[in-house]
Design a protein with these regions (language model features):
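Short, conserved sequence motifs used for protein processing/export or organelle targeting and
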Residues: 1-207
């Protein structure tokens, strides 16, 4: 099974982890080549997602549309899962454990732009093992069906040019004090191939 017991159990019990996976696991310090290979894979269905606030401003209504661009194998079954993410999160009290202090040296002057934050010595504390002032993006706030997809979210056979629609709601968003800017919320819709235990396609949108 591709997702037998979750990230925290399998990889890191105490530290945040990132596992970027579709058919293959992408891990290690540099998964660029595997990531590019995953992007080049053709998917059977297209997926599109839209999200909007309801009249109370406290719930997010989500609509996902799935349309086959090729006819999937007859035995394949699919389901949709969702993640609500927040970006732009920052707190002076937050520290992130990082081992990137070597990037402050000229040896890494040609590092990609995303490493610029780690090139500044003033961002390090506690023996250069933690960084402060980091802005966290794409932080998961709430999920639905994140391991296998929501049961019965997509039913029946898939026919080319025939759109299947699924709707859901993220409720009581005001309960999440972690959210700092509602304009930086996104909904990610994940299309699971439940027959072969893999992620087939993904779409995301702003609310």
């Amino acid at each position: 099974k591709a997702y037998p017991s979750g990230m925290l159990t399998d990889y890191a019990r105490t530290l945040p982890s990132l596992w970027c996976a579709r058919k293959s696991k992408i891990a290690g310090y540099d998964g660029t080549s595997m990531f590019e290979n995953e992007k080049s894979e053709v998917t059977y269905p297209n997926i599109d997602v839209e999200a909007c606030w309801d009249e109370t401003g406290n719930n997010i209504n989500v609509t996902t549309k799935v349309e086959p661009c090729m006819t999937p194998d007859a035995v394949n079954t699919y389901a949709i899962g969702y993640v609500l993410t927040a970006s732009g999160l920052k707190n002076d009290k937050w520290l992130q454990q990082a081992d990137y202090s070597a990037y402050t040296s000229d040896s890494y002057k040609d590092a990609p732009p995303e490493m610029d934050f780690f090139r500044n010595p003033s961002n390090y504390v506690d023996g250069n093992y933690y960084v402060k002032g980091y802005t966290f993006n794409h932080v998961a706030i709430e999920s639905q069906g994140i391991r296998y997809g929501i049961a019965n979210s997509l039913t029946g056979n898939f026919v080319p040019n025939e759109i299947k629609t699924h709707t859901t709601t993220f409720s009581n968003i005001n309960q999440y004090n972690l959210i700092q800017d509602r304009n930086k919320l996104e909904v990610v819709a994940i299309l699971f191939d439940t027959k072969n235990d893999r992620i087939e396609n993904v779409a995301k949108c702003r609310i």
